[in-house]
Amino acid sequence: MKTRIITAIVGILVLIGVMFTFNTMVFNLVIAAITLIAIHEIYSALGFEKKDWLMYAVLVPYTLLGMLSSYSAMRKLVMPMSFVLVTFFAIYLVVRNGTISYQKASGLLVFSGIVIFCFYSFVLLKERLPVEKFGYDAVFFILLILCFAWGGDTCAYFAGRAFGKHKLCPVVSPKKTVEGAIGGVLGTMVFGVVATLIYSIAANRMEAFTRSNIGVSMYVIIALLGCIAAVLGIYGDLFASVVKRQCGIKDYGTIFPGHGGILDRFDSVMFIAPFVTMVITAVFYA
């Protein structure tokens, strides 16, 4: 427990440091590095051999290009980049002549795609909500996404310990309970509304958040987002657990002592980040 607490404190300090670089290319580079580490964890979990390093290496330029390019450039590049990537995987399977399984290659491609979309969401928020025009709204929403994920996990943990009686998904995650999940949903909604209220007051955004361009208060939308995000966070956690069980591993990595790897810490963020980003950018900042 002591190791977990120390790691969490260090992680929070690092997160604060990274957010100070938000308006620079350093932020994009950090996100790209985190993404590549996560993809490498997938590569290792699926049991690829060293001679299959190309399977991972080909994802490096794809990831870097995505994280370091502007949104307008990405819109033009995503189709040709995806075509080249999928074609490479198909050719590689043929060249290896059946010595590498289609299931493993597909798993790497799909799981990596989920991870890339997850972390690209942070870059997209930066691009679509520039500091010069919207202040630090993008920083707030990135932190809100993490708050949805990790705050929901915390609420679910304590609610489960206090009231948990009915197993949620015993085969995949024996410790998760229905009561814990409900506590996580309610806690996430409260976390979201309180965090939004604090930010809107501190950043003098009360009027903008109260009277959104769709006629619905941002606080109402955040509460609804929190509810859906909590469910997506639980699903992301279960999805990552299923993969770990099928791969026969306990953790995806050891980069966070006491917590595991990047994917062990960001599993609940995987589906929350793209969802919240799409809603926020499409509804409030269209």
Label the model's feature ranges.
Residues 245-268:
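Interfacial loop-to-transmembrane junctions
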Residues 228-233, 256:
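Transmembrane alpha-helix interface/packing and boundary motifs in multi-pass membrane proteins
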